[in-house]
Amino acid sequence: MAGALRKMAVYLGLVEDDRYDHRYADEYDDFEDFDEPLDERPSRNRSPRDDSRNNAVTDSSDHSPSRNERRSPAPAPATADLARITTLHPRTYNEARTIGEHFREGIPVIMNLTEMVDSDAKRLVDFAAGLIFGLHGSIERVTNKVFLLSPANVEVTAEDKARIAERGFFNQS
């Protein structure tokens, strides 16, 4: 019974585990700096099997980006016509993919969430915020539950908003 109580006390951190083996304490002192390129790292002693596998990876790595290289999203079209603004009226969160696809193509999206349940609308706004962050766009609240998502290469000015409002895009609340 005392063994079970001792194990519980060790688990809760109330006492130290006496069974700690100090022979292995210095095993993790050497660390690899992952910021250095692979060629500059000190090589370890490897078995021939590991070396052959490493050579195969090295040969194919000439065409692939390195692990430390940052990837940027695919560039959107250079110019986006404001006449291509897409207005979507999602009813469920499952329609988030459509919003993402249009936005990723560089098309400004007006999200009208008035027909959605509040919990799903909040999830969709969170999705849109992640989309905006990931693709360097901007999001504006037009009215209650209506949002304009603009890609990075598109700037919607007040004049453009007025022109869009005349056509009825913003008057959907």
Swiss-Prot record:
Keyword Cytoplasm: yes
Biased composition (Basic and acidic residues): 39-53, 60-72
One GO term (biological process): division septum assembly
Any single Pfam family the record assigns to this protein: SepF
Disordered: region residues: 31-82
InterPro entries tied to this protein: Cell_div_SepF (IPR023052), Cell_div_SepF/SepF-rel (IPR007561), SepF-like_sf (IPR038594)
GO CC, alphabetical: cytoplasm
Transmembrane segments: none
Presence of keyword Transport: no
UniProtKB keywords: Cell cycle, Cell division, Cytoplasm, Septation
Primary location class: cytoplasm
Subcellular location: Cytoplasm
Family: Belongs to the SepF family.
Subunit structure: Homodimer. Interacts with FtsZ.
Primary role: Cell division protein that is part of the divisome complex and is recruited early to the Z-ring. Probably stimulates Z-ring formation, perhaps through the cross-linking of FtsZ protofilaments. Its function overlaps with FtsA.
Annotated protein name in UniProt: Cell division protein SepF
Protein source organism: Thermobifida fusca (strain YX)
